């Protein structure tokens, strides 16, 4: 019998406006992976979607490098593997594609190296590699999660928030925006006054989400001062999306992660009309309704006749 590990890894949206590098939510767009042992000296990567075209298929592959680094960390040896991949998560669009790949690599190393890492340990490892938990935490656990990574202790603490009862619209531009380029425009420091103000806005947003006060939560999301004022000019469609969304009584329109994808939270009774309007008025972008993934990574092992 041939043993195949199957992974279904969700996309994620980070920040929700003012929750910079600390808040994220899993979405129902996925990286699918099927992994099996092969009798070869090298790993084999097979891609079955346009989103993955151009990615390395040799030792420069990020999943390969990460899995081997984890195996080395725990003093185990991984067999040669064949990894089949398909994805509907666009690359470099602010939807956690790199976090999904990272989490996939950790699950691969954990299973085929028989390391026996718990989900908590997988989170610690993922955050240490990524530097912040905003994408990897919801990717692993699902739902809406706030977290803090302490770079001194290398410990990540997270708390799960009930997912908002709203509809989610993604407006995905046709161009990429690399995280490193998007981070380059951010200031190195903030004044004490500015930090206090943004902390207050973030705290209020969290409380409003917990209390299902989505108008208040949205008001706070749109007052971010940590990153959005510096990044909006990189996304020409942003202001028009926010304007149209407000005309349809949306709760908030913010940048998803580092962008360029634009995230809109909308009342369920308004979302259909809004997404159709966005498709009509901003037709160079792909606007779509998505739902929140609440379970995180789905992994299963299947056995096939050889």
From Swiss-Prot:
Pfam family, one: GHMP_kinases_C
Role this protein plays: Catalyzes the ATP-dependent phosphorylation of L-homoserine to L-homoserine phosphate.
Species name: Staphylococcus epidermidis (strain ATCC 12228 / FDA PCI 1200)
Primary location: cytoplasm
Positions bound to ATP: 90-100
Gene Ontology MF terms: ATP binding; homoserine kinase activity
Gene3D superfamilies with a match to the protein in the record: 3.30.230.10, GHMP kinase, C-terminal domain
NCBIfam families in the cross-refs: thrB
Subcellular location: Cytoplasm
Domain of life: Bacteria
Gene Ontology CC terms, in alphabetical order: cytoplasm
Pathway connected to this protein: Amino-acid biosynthesis; L-threonine biosynthesis; L-threonine from L-aspartate: step 4/5
GO biological process, alphabetically ordered: threonine biosynthetic process
E.C. number(s) listed in UniProt: 2.7.1.39
UniProt entry tagged with the keyword Transferase: yes
Keyword set, alphabetical order: Amino-acid biosynthesis, ATP-binding, Cytoplasm, Kinase, Nucleotide-binding, Threonine biosynthesis, Transferase
Catalysed reactions, as listed in the record: L-homoserine + ATP = O-phospho-L-homoserine + ADP + H(+)
Entry similarity comment: Belongs to the GHMP kinase family. Homoserine kinase subfamily.
Source organism phylogeny: Bacteria, Bacillati, Bacillota, Bacilli, Bacillales
UniProt name for this protein: Homoserine kinase
Enzyme class: transferase
